[in-house]
Every structure is written in structure tokens, then in C-alpha cells.
Amino acid sequence: MNKINCFVPFSGAAQAEKTVKGLQETGLVNNIYLLALPDVTENLPGCSTLHMQSIQSSAAIRDIAGHSDAEYTLIYTKYTTLELGLFALERMIHIAEDSGAGMVYADRYQVKEGKQTNAPVIDYQFGSLRDDFDFGSVLLFRTDTFKEAAARMNEDEYKFAGLYDLRLKVSQNESLVHINEYLYSEIEDDTRKSGEKIFDYVDPRNRDRQIEMEQAFTEH
């Protein structure tokens, strides 16, 4: 039952191998795509690499849509190790099917220096338009919804607001459902080797980013 294509940020094998192994062991995964900067040359067994300039860009979202050929599309948005809870993906699929949601997201734990803290998220209200709304780092979309929303995305090529634009498009026609359960953990390991290339973190106050978010919001 390979129902999910997964898309995972990738800077090198050490950073992503535990995340990939955990996804592969669920038995629900069709393909895993590693999202990497153009000069990243490493790979992981059983995965394909998609090279892109920014994981948040419109081009990245269209690329993901073009490689989404399973029933569900999972995007993981962090470089930290993802550790899924028991039957977490089954639970997400079950609720997506029962609710008819276009996207589901869940509460999670964050583990830093061995210390676990709860990191709950809140229910999405229609009209929750803030670009900093916290969905957590695991977003599970129905693929038909994802593709349809990506096809309606703003023709402007966003560098920073692609994922935000997609989320706004999904919310226009579909529900975004919060699963009020702790289904996964984000585990901070400092496995990154010096010089390893990652997508640049962009400060939310960055002016270019703010302008793009405002454009996406206005167009919505």
C-alpha cells in the first residue's frame, strides 16, 4: 500500500538518513525525493534527488507537484531528524480520508539536547491568513488537491512565498485539518559537517520575503 510520495530537505547523507529510514520502514511510501541545492552531490539509497534553489519557492512547489504520483504528498520542512510515532502516517491518512481534508497536520514533540518538549499546533480557522501560522513540519496533502492548487498558483515566481501561496490556494477550496495528537518528533542532532550546503534560513523580517508574502496574501 504505497500511498505517499515524500519530499525531504537534504544537505547530505548524515543529516537525512534517519528521517529517510523511518519513512521507508512505514511501508506506506511510494517514492522519497530529496530536496537539495544544485551543488549537493550526495544521495541516499532508494531516493531520488531534486535540485532547486529554494525549498520555499514557487518553482520548488511546481517541481514537487510534477513528481507527486501517489495518492498523498508529504512535505517535511525541516533539516532536523524526523522520528514518526507508531502508525503516525496511517493515522494521518485515516483522518484525511474520514474528513475529506485537502491537508492534515498534527501536534509534535521537539527534542533538543536529549530534552523533549511538547510543541502543539492549533486548529486552522477559515481566514487564518498569517504567513507564520504554525502547522508543524509534516504536511500531508491529498495529491489531487496539491496539484490543483499548484496549477492555480500566482504566475509571479516567488522565492520565499511559494509554500505560503500553495497553502492559501488549498484553503480556498479544501479544509486544513489539525490532528490533535502527538504523532512525530523533530530531533535536533548536530550532524551537519562544516561546509554542508543547506537552503538559507530567511529571517521573517527580511524585506523581500515580507513583500512576497504580502503579494501572495493580496492575490488570495
Residue ranges and their predicted role:
Residues 145, 156-182, 187, 217:
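A short, conserved alpha-helix in the catalytic core of glycosyltransferases
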Residues 52-68:
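Glycine-rich, basic loop-to-helix element that forms the pyrophosphate-binding segment
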Residues 117-145:
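A recurrent flexible, glycine/aromatic-enriched loop bordering the glycosyltransferase active site
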Residues 180-202:
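Active-site donor/metal-binding and catalytic loop motifs
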Residues 69-83:
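Short beta-strand-to-loop acidic/aromatic patch adjacent to the donor-nucleotide binding site
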Residues 81, 86-119:
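Conserved donor NDP-sugar-binding/catalytic core segment of glycosyltransferases
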Residues 18-30:
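Short, acidic, metal-binding catalytic loop of nucleotide-sugar glycosyltransferases
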Residues 199-220:
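C-terminal, non-catalytic tails of nucleotide-sugar-dependent glycosyltransferases
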